[in-house]
Amino acid sequence: MTYITDLPAIQDMAFCLGKEGCLFITLCAIAERITHKPIDVLRSARELINLKLLDYVEENPSQHLKEAFFVKDRDLVLAYLTGIKGITTLKTHRLSKTEKRPYYIRYATETVPPKTHFVLPDYSSLYHSLTVENGTIDSYYIIVVPKKEN
């Protein structure tokens, strides 16, 4: 078990997660829906940072917000969060109206560089996102969970 005191500078980490962690939070939400179990977002983030699957600058993290919580490998992060090996993500620009698999959406603005925000069809980590309001749907990411072997 990881105690709160085992998480160095947790307030800095929570700040960065709030500013730049929408994809990671969205992946946690998907993992919770797949496993039907709650995820401790901060502890999971720390473990994934230690595994080098999330970017995070320990020293003065608020000065490195753009690097904070960049997800290096969505599939490995989902596998870690769900405990399911072989889980994959398919990127598409069109989504079938009959799609049954879990998916999330990437919104992007046309600014340079573009601003992005990741959401579920029925959940966003922000009450109000200017990126969603002013941007457009850039792509969909469908989660493919491998069938269980008997």
Where are these regions (language model features)?
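Noncatalytic regulatory segments and standalone regulatory/sensor domains
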Residues: 19, 96-103, 107, 118-150
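Active-site-adjacent structural segments surrounding the nucleophilic cysteine of cysteine proteases
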Residues: 1-65, 144-149
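...with weaker cross-activation on analogous glycine-rich loops/strands in unrelated enzymes
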Residues: 57-121
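Compositionally biased, low-complexity repeat tracts
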Residues: 17, 79-82, 131
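Low-complexity, compositionally biased segments
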Residues: 9, 15, 43, 58, ...
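Substrate-binding/catalytic groove segments of enzymes
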Residues: 36, 87-89, 127
